[in-house]
Amino acid sequence: IHSNNMAPGTNFDYVQSQLKWKSLCDYFMFNSYVVNQDWLNWNTAWWRGMDPAGDKTKWRYTLWDMDATFGHYVNYTGIPDPTANADPCNVEGLPNPGGQGHTDILEKLINENPEVEQYYVQRYVDLANTYFSCDYMITLLDSMLNEISPEMTRHTAKWGGSVAGWN
């Protein structure tokens, strides 16, 4: 991706044969939406299936270790604006800590391939109006809080802290 033009054609066709590039877009959208402060250099994961005859042969990004979201934890990645007012569409403003290139790959795909650019914009708008909407997120987060809350007394007894501090 770094050394080839990603305009529609042979180079991009090869990338599509190896990488589910939409998962990279979704990965960036979700992490930027929740203002994850620990993802570009540390908690990045990708996988593919090992069965050559299976349907999971392309590399794809996956979410994990999401405790540094919504302004919690330490800003290890150096996100320029970790507040709720951060611009989720400012891929160019994200750093490339550790030189791992995830940001550069997405930026190059968006800038050189109209299909990727269109997908990124439309998908982000769709998510903003559905799964990222306040109504949906508040309901989801409240349900998660209700699921986790009964465990917090035992958790703080074992690991320290307080339930009040967790809330």
Placement of each model-derived feature along the sequence:
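Middle-to-C-terminal accessory/interaction subdomains
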Residues: 1-50, 54-167
